Amino acid sequence: MPDGVRGRTVLIAGATSSSGLAAAHALADAGALVIAVGRDAAKLDALAAAVPPARTAECDLGAEADVRALADTLRADGVRVDGILHLVGGWRGGGGLAGQSDADYRALEVGLTALRHVTRAFWDGLLASDAARCAIVSSTAVARPLAGGANYAAVKAAEEAWARAMAQGFAKDARDEAREVRAASVVFRVRALAGLETVLAERFTGLWDAEAAAINDTVVQIDAA
């Protein structure tokens, strides 16, 4: 049976939101080493004060060189990441299909770019872990996109595709090494994240309590109570 998240190192990408704080609390309370990453130094300081065990790192996750430098720094410190919670993103929309501007799309696309950068930079470590867990927060809009949110739904769909490709990569690595799957990539879908921060944190932390093969390449919808 899985041993849970205790003793694991988990990176929260885009950690300075309320969801990031909730995840940091849940992970630290469960015995994980938390690495909270974001761009806002003041908010990272506040998170560090609220969750004293957490390590923070200021990094522009949309800049590949910065993410590579962060990964190199952690490796030099002897840190191997066992999990990633991807929280980089936001909402822009409205105005029907004609109102889906390039400016809004580019702003939203940063979430996908950050996901690509972070998972590539830490991929080898995730494969080496005996219990890697990764998750993204997507949207129910992927299953039912609306004209006024087409940009948003398109980016979230791309993020889901990337997360599912990670799942296939984990499964392939296990086959190639002739061993059981020990890593999992999961998509959490929400209609709106506000009010579900604690639930998301608990669901993510709980991924280490499940067998990797049972949850890899799954889509989990989180609904309001």
Question: Where do the PLM segments sit?
Answer:
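Rossmann-fold cofactor-recognition segment
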Residues: 51-65
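Conserved NAD(P)H cofactor-binding loop of Rossmann-fold oxidoreductase domains
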Residues: 85-94
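Conserved glycine-rich cofactor-binding loop
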Residues: 16-18
